[in-house]
């Protein structure tokens, strides 16, 4: 079954159209143009924002009152080896198991299609709805994420745009659609650590300083450190060394330098400044000649039970009969940028079992459920 099949629902028809556009990050491949045409027909004011090589758009419909924003990305990760795919990654096929197959089916063109169709239905049913509906869409989520949602949020905040609630279409579900929603994410703080020694001959260690030997006790202490206890919403902060490099390649040379890359995934119980100070104190304690370059990817954010989370949970219950489980696990998402506006943020999307894999796929029927969940959430918040 393909995108041209007359038996496809509006959601699946649009999902297939989006998947068939090969929008490997940071390319958009006219996905946003397709979405904007649909939104313009539904009465949205459109504001394309091309920033550097990244396509973004902001769309808004409605007047004063609370604003519910749908956020997501049109870019997808590379396909990997084409010969490993059962179907070509941009053909958008529904197989005999009822799975919509293709790059972006789960992450996150299926969600984008569900959002658009849900909003079209809601606007048709409630043309004089309360508040406003908005869309914030980027083609820079899977890449560096410098000129996408982050940059758009900065522009919106600078002109005083209001964003009360935001649903991000990331694939949050684990086994069944709606079984898990993300109501927050841990912060991500990375670093490049350089330990300087003195290069020399391995036969004359007294004339050298081996940075590997010097760094090992400090790295062991950092790895064993108890950073915090976490809380009811977040697990304890974790520290992981991801790269360790030293040496000239020769077996008879003591290296002069060691570099280590490490990362914190941290809860709201820790701060950036606090983690940095504790790391630097441990390095000083071991008498190291060190230099560290810090890189903050995002602060932790949390949406506690309230209007948005309650509406999403009630909609999932009404559509699927199941109770959703709020979670803050996993990596970072663009929700971290939107949360800086004081916005309640919830991530809700399809099952994430095959994201970024070859043969990415999602149950076609799950996208129908997701469309209805988005629709019911709109009704609860803005009807």
Curated annotation (Swiss-Prot):
Reaction it catalyzes: N-succinyl-(2S,6S)-2,6-diaminopimelate + H2O = (2S,6S)-2,6-diaminopimelate + succinate
Pathway: Amino-acid biosynthesis; L-lysine biosynthesis via DAP pathway; LL-2,6-diaminopimelate from (S)-tetrahydrodipicolinate (succinylase route): step 3/3
Cofactor: how and how many bound: Binds 2 Zn(2+) or Co(2+) ions per subunit.
Any one of the GO BP annotations: diaminopimelate biosynthetic process
Keyword presence, Ubl conjugation: no
Taxonomic superkingdom: Bacteria
Residues annotated as binding Zn(2+) 2: 107, 142, 356
GO molecular function, one term: succinyl-diaminopimelate desuccinylase activity
List of catalytic residues: 75, 141 (proton acceptor)
CC cofactor: Zn(2+); Co(2+)
Keyword terms, alphabetized: Amino-acid biosynthesis, Cobalt, Diaminopimelate biosynthesis, Hydrolase, Lysine biosynthesis, Metal-binding, Zinc
Keyword hit for Protein biosynthesis: no
Positions with a binding annotation for Zn(2+) 1: 73, 107, 170
InterPro entries linked to this entry: ArgE/DapE_CS, Bact_exopeptidase_dim_dom, DapE_proteobac, Peptidase_M20, Peptidase_M20_dimer, Peptidase_M20A
Enzyme class: hydrolase
Protein role: Catalyzes the hydrolysis of N-succinyl-L,L-diaminopimelic acid (SDAP), forming succinate and LL-2,6-diaminopimelate (DAP), an intermediate involved in the bacterial biosynthesis of lysine and meso-diaminopimelic acid, an essential component of bacterial cell walls.
Family, per entry: Belongs to the peptidase M20A family. DapE subfamily.
Assembly and oligomerization: Homodimer.
PANTHER family, A to Z: ACETYLORNITHINE DEACETYLASE, N-ACETYL-L-CITRULLINE DEACETYLASE
Name of the molecule in the record: Succinyl-diaminopimelate desuccinylase
């Amino acid at each position: 079954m393909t995108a041209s099949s007359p038996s496809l629902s509006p959601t699946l028809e649009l999902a297939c159209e989006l998947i068939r556009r090969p929008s490997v990050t940071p390319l958009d491949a006219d996905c946003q143009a397709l979405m904007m045409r649909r939104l313009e027909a539904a009465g949205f004011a459109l504001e394309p924002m091309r920033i550097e090589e990244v396509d973004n758009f902001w769309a808004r419909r409605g007047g004063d009152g609370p604003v519910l924003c749908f956020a997501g990305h049109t870019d997808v990760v590379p396909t990997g080896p084409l010969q490993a795919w059962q179907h070509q990654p941009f053909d958008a096929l529904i197989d005999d198991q009822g799975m919509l197959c293709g790059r972006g089916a789960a992450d996150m063109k299926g969600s984008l299609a569900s959002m658009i169709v849900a909003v079209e239905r809601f606007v048709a049913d409630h043309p004089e709805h309360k508040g406003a509906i908005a869309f914030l869409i980027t083609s820079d989520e899977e890449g560096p994420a410098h000129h996408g949602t982050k940059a758009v949020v900065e522009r919106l905040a600078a002109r005083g745009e209001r964003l009360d609630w935001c649903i991000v279409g990331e694939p949050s579900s684990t086994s069944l659609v709606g079984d898990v929603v993300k109501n927050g994410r841990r912060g991500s703080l990375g670093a490049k650590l350089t330990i300087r020694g003195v290069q020399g001959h391995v036969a004359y260690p007294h004339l050298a300083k081996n940075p590997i030997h010097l760094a090992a006790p400090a790295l062991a202490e950092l790895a064993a450190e108890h950073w915090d206890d976490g809380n009811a919403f977040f697990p304890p902060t974790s520290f992981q060394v991801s790269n360790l490099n030293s040496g000239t390649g020769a077996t008879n040379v003591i290296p002069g330098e060691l570099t280590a890359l490490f990362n914190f995934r941290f809860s709201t119980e820790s701060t950036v400044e606090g983690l940095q100070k504790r790391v630097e104190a441990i390095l000083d304690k071991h008498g190291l000649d060190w230099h560290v370059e810090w890189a903050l990817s995002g602060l932790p954010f949390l949406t506690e039970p309230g209007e948005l989370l309650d509406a999403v949970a009630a909609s999932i219950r009404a559509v699927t009969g199941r109770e959703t489980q709020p979670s803050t696990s996993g990596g970072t998402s663009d929700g971290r940028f939107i949360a800086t506006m004081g916005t309640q943020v919830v991530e809700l999307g399809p099952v994430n079992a095959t994201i970024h894999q070859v043969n990415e796929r999602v149950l076609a029927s799950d996208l129908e459920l997701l469309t209805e969940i988005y629709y019911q959430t709109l009704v609860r918040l803005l009807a």
